[in-house]
Each structure stands twice: as structure tokens, then as C-alpha cells.
């Protein structure tokens, strides 16, 4: 039975579609290979492995054994294998200090190996939002796909792919905060409209320190955007000492004229380069 992974290989050319042995092991030879002869998959999208979950898996394997063999390929170094699928099982077996592990050896290219690792993890739905976004980006690059085509192959909405990829445009501190579960993906998406990395990191600090929820974060973003749109008032030039003396002299003279019984209508306007004084004397 063909696994959905195969839809990525050969861009639909059936004769080039390899089968993923993990899901159809009846026709594959299962070998016992040394645990210490295996190296991790360099295309592994997962960067964080939960020690607690590895420990739980190790207990299950200790009780029931390995139901599904891992999948590996030969490396250039003789007697060494690179993981294609099953890193959690391999780590669990390492913790049990087993010497050998059941495995199926495949002859996969780098592209096929990377695709299997990426898609296997995506389908397990255990990746962080950032790891998932990097996986999507890598698949788009490996197979020269559009977001829409990738969404169809994974059975996801195009908007889901797009929303995840937008997270990769956020500054590194924000991405790390998602990975470390200091903020949620929704918090991170709320920061995107700010655009300026400095503002995004500033608000990130506030979210963490004040434990802001998503709605509060969105409100803060709106306020920060409004503040950025306000144009600062142009600075007026300071009056020189001579200008102040001249204006005071004129005002005193006008005051003396009004004291004599003549009603004046005066207006003062201040411009960038000068002060305009308008005097109206009724006939």
C-alpha cells in the first residue's frame, strides 16, 4: 500500500514513487542493527524532544518490545546508518541501553529522506508551530511547490500553511518564545502587524512579564500602531532675544494707543520663519 509520503516523490510519476516501509513491513526484510551505529536524521524538523515522553515510550518498549521497526539508510561511512524515521524509538532504546534495534534499510536520496522525516513529524502533529513552519518551508523548497500544492498534498488548508510560514518572519526571540511555550502561536500572530522587529520584541517582553492574554496583546498592538501613525508636531524655532524685545515694544505701543481711546483689532500669527502682526484700525 502506498503511503501519502509517496505523493511528494517524482512529482506524481508513479514509477518513481518509493514505498515507506514503516507502514508496509510485510515485504521488507527487518534486520537487527547496532544502536550505536545509527546517527540522527540531519533533516529532522524536531529540535526539542521531551525527556518525559521518551521515558514513557522506553517503558512501553521495555514491556511490549518494538512493534514497528525504525527505517534507516546507509551513510558513506561503512557500517553506519542514518535514521529516516523512528528517532523517538531510537532514543528510547538508547535509554534502555539495548545493543540492537529492529530496522529496515532503504535506499533513499537526500530529498526522499528529508521528505519522509518532515512529513512523518507533520502527521504526528507533535511539532511546535515554528518546527512545523520550518518543515513546510523545507518541503516547498525541496519539491518546488506552491503553498496551494503543498496544502493539497498534506490535506490541509492553504491558509494553514500560509499562517505557519508567516511565523518565520518574526524575530528570533519571538520564535524562541513559541518554542519554549512562553507565548502561544496566537500571541505571535498578533505581533505580525507591528512589522518592526524592535516593537515586536518590546511587546513580547510585555506579554511575558504581564502575562497578557491574546485579546490584551491585540489591543496593545492597536495602540502601538495608532501611536506610530500620529505625526509629531513640527518644532517651532525659539524666539531670539531681539525678536522678543521687538514684539514687547510693539505690544506696549499698541496698548498705549488703545489707552488713548482708539479701539484696535490685532492678530498675531507665528510661522516657521517669521511672526505676522495684523493691525486693523476702524475709521
UniProtKB/Swiss-Prot annotation:
DNA-binding region, residue range(s): 148-167
Q: Which residues form a coiled coil?
A: none
Record bears the keyword Cell cycle: yes
A Gene Ontology annotation in the biological process aspect, one of them, is: division septum assembly
Keywords, in A-Z order: Cell cycle, Cell division, Cytoplasm, DNA-binding, Septation
Under what conditions is it induced? Expressed constitutively.
Q: Which GO terms describe its molecular function?
A: DNA binding
Cystine pairs annotated here are none
**Entry's localization field:** Cytoplasm, Nucleoid
Similarity remark: Belongs to the ParB family.
The record's function comment reads: Effects nucleoid occlusion by binding relatively nonspecifically to DNA and preventing the assembly of the division machinery in the vicinity of the nucleoid, especially under conditions that disturb the cell cycle. It helps to coordinate cell division and chromosome segregation by preventing the formation of the Z ring through the nucleoid, which would cause chromosome breakage.
**Record's protein name:** Nucleoid occlusion protein
- Which species is this record about? Bacillus subtilis (strain 168)
Task: Name the lineage.
Answer: Bacteria, Bacillati, Bacillota, Bacilli, Bacillales
**Quick one: which gene encodes this?**
noc
